[in-house]
Amino acid sequence: MVVGSGQESLLRAPDSPTDQAARRLARALALPHRPISDPHSPDRQLQLLQASGEGWLASLPLDPGQALPDGSTWAEALGAWCQPTLVILGAQQLSSGAAASSTALLRQWRVPLLGLVQWGGSWKGDLRRRDGLPWLGRLEEGAAEGSDATSDLVGLLRQRWTLLDLPVPS
């Protein structure tokens, strides 16, 4: 699952960074990109996704910590379903604490966190390493398919899947 952090309007926007990243990574991993047709029903959506019987990537159009009408959250469901999750954060979010709060939220619910990916902006590896969060790297807006950065990120994603003792999607 690929998730973002922040306002619903930014996550649901056509071609949101979360959706673009999920589609690009799905292509690079040779996985289908699956839609979330009803974001207010996480257990049902995860059940449908799991029933496909194959690997997939989906982009969540809500912040995983956002309370749903029944009081649940996607973070809670992702943890209950042991769903490996990748967090996409826009470069403009890096100074806001969104990376740390997203990491803490997902860890609280025991979500298998694959890592964090910066969307756009310039990569400051020293700062990312200093914050101690599980950063995997950066994806550039509009980068060509098969770019070195995407290939490197896919390699790191596969390593994280292995480190978390999860089946690596093929």
Residue ranges and their predicted role:
Residues 52-58:
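Loop/turn-to-beta-strand initiation segments
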Residues 155-170:
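C-terminal-of-GTPase-core extension/linker across diverse P-loop GTPases
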Residues 23, 46, 151-158:
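Generic detector of well-ordered alpha-helical segments enriched in charged/polar residues
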Residues 60-156:
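Conserved catalytic-core segment of NTP-binding enzymes
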Residues 31-34, 133, 166-168:
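Intrinsic-disorder/low-complexity coil detector
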Residues 1-52:
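Extended, compositionally biased accessory segments flanking or bridging domains
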